[in-house]
């Protein structure tokens, strides 16, 4: 192996360097902290249920404004359901009476202790997540200073809804300044997911000569097993690639949209199943991601109707080709509407 590598016959593995390696480390640390905070939320919900306090059933997000106010009041010693329900935020859908009925519990000391500890650990995780956000923002600014890519005008955002557990700064603007393109214009890629992809793959994709090399590295391309000139299997190989997992999440999201990628996912899902449709759609998103970073290509979605029209054209061309090979000619039939008799 060493001899082959010495003569340049082996392709090097991809390892991020410099600031990209630091960005990836900060993002992975932040992800671990978010997962840890989620486990502490579950501990709080368990403590509330053991005290028969069902506030998490009437408040959509227990870690929202209303939920946190109530939890902090309980931890500081408040037990009156009326006083606790008065912490309701005006945007909360449940009324004060509903919240008050859900705040009648047994208030056992051991469960209150577990609730207090879980809340303290959750707050500690949030503080560490905020520290990670500062490190990530500073790293992106250093990468921007090293970048020589021309930056045009940032296009309007497709969605202004804030994602849960999003970083505490404008990711779209920061990534656009670094990359020169807006990755969030690709359907399925939100700001947080685009940031994680850049952290895993870097800003320079020249390590992969083509999009086919890139999708093969991700484990999203068919892994053909050939014996005697015959393809025995073309299943994708098993891979623990984090970027591939992110792209699969994007594929599931885009499958619910009225876009060309969404129409492709739904048509393939009905034919070969959801698992293969997710992989195939993830591969398409990976190609768009590669072309955007490597060649600076902007993505404009043609829409689901355009995809369906192109699909019908391909089916018709295939039928015409098969008919011609058999000595027939396809002719469009004028089908008159059926007459409806009235008795």
Language-model features: locations:
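A detector of single, family-specific signature residues
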Residues: 1-343
